[in-house]
C-alpha cells in the first residue's frame, strides 16, 4: 500500500469530517485506535468496506475513488491510529 497516497486521498476526501482522526458527525466514532477496535474497524478490510459502501452519515466513496486509492487510505488510517494521529 502507498501510505503517502493514502494521506493525499484522506486530506482531499476524508479530512472535512475526520481531521486528526476525529469525527465531526458522530464524535464517539473516531478513527482513534481504541474506537476502531471497539467498533471492529481495526482492519484494512473493514475500513475499505465502509469507505467503499458508506454507512449512516458517511457517504460511499466506491464510485469516486479507485479500489487502490481506498486501500491506500485504509492503510493510512490504520497507520495513523497506531501513531495516535500525531
From Swiss-Prot:
Compartments reported by the entry: Plastid, Chloroplast thylakoid lumen
A family per Pfam: Cytochrome_CBB3
GO molecular function, one term: iron ion binding
PROSITE patterns named in the record: CYTC
Gene of this entry: petJ
Database matches in InterPro entries: Cyt_c-like_dom, Cyt_c-like_dom_sf, Cyt_C6, Cyt_C_IC
GO CC, any one term: chloroplast thylakoid lumen
Assigned protein family: Belongs to the cytochrome c family. PetJ subfamily.
Binding, heme c: 14, 17-18, 58
Keyword Thylakoid: yes
GO biological process, one term: photosynthesis
Organism this protein belongs to: Bumilleriopsis filiformis (Yellow-green alga)
Function text: Functions as an electron carrier between membrane-bound cytochrome b6-f and photosystem I in oxygenic photosynthesis.
Identification of the protein by name: Cytochrome c6
Superkingdom, taxonomy of origin: Eukaryota
The protein's assembly and partners: Monomer.
Amino acid at each position: 500500500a502507498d501510505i503517502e497516497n493514502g494521506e493525499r486521498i484522506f486530506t482531499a476526501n476524508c479530512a472535512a469530517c475526520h481531521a486528526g482522526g476525529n469525527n465531526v458527525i458522530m464524535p464517539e466514532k473516531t478513527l482513534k485506535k481504541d474506537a476502531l477496535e471497539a467498533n471492529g474497524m481495526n482492519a484494512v478490510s473493514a475500513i475499505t468496506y465502509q469507505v467503499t459502501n458508506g454507512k449512516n452519515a458517511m457517504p460511499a466513496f466506491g464510485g469516486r475513488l479507485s479500489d487502490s486509492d481506498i486501500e491506500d487510505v485504509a492503510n493510512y488510517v490504520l497507520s495513523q491510529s497506531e501513531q495516535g494521529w500525531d
